Regions:
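Residue-level detector of intrinsically disordered, flexible termini
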Residues: 8-9, 90, 94, 104-105
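A charged, well-structured terminal subsegment
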Residues: 98-112
Length: 112
């Protein structure tokens, strides 16, 4: 599991995750992800290169969203593939965290 950070316009931070977001992957990215969560308030999490999403990974995303929301910020999930999107829907995550298919749609949520 790889994690990369890009700064977008309007103070938006894009976190790009790549690989299997299984338990091992979640453990690898949890600390750097939590550091980003504590420092930034508008975050797009790009899951387009994530091939698998485990329950521990869902927890990492949910906890991050709750922390950001508690500080008045927002987190949006970007471009999950069909399998990952299905897992998010099944877990009810799409009702808790906005999920968008394009970067422009994701950034629009964060700037509204």
């Amino acid at each position: 599991m790889d994690i990369a950070v890009e700064e977008l316009a309007a103070g938006i931070t894009k976190v790009v995750l790549r690989g299997r977001f299984d338990t091992t992957g979640a453990v690898l990215v949890e600390l750097p992800f939590n550091k980003i969560i504590t420092e930034k308030s508008r975050i797009v999490v790009d899951l387009s290169a994530v091939s698998f999403l485990a329950s521990y990974a869902i927890r990492v995303l949910l906890v991050g969203a709750k922390i950001i929301n508690g500080r008045g910020g927002k987190l949006v999930i970007l471009c999950p593939d069909n399998n990952v999107a299905k897992v998010l829907r099944t877990a009810g995550m799409d009702a808790l965290i906005p999920v968008r298919q394009t970067e422009s749609a994701a950034t629009a949520v964060l700037t509204s």
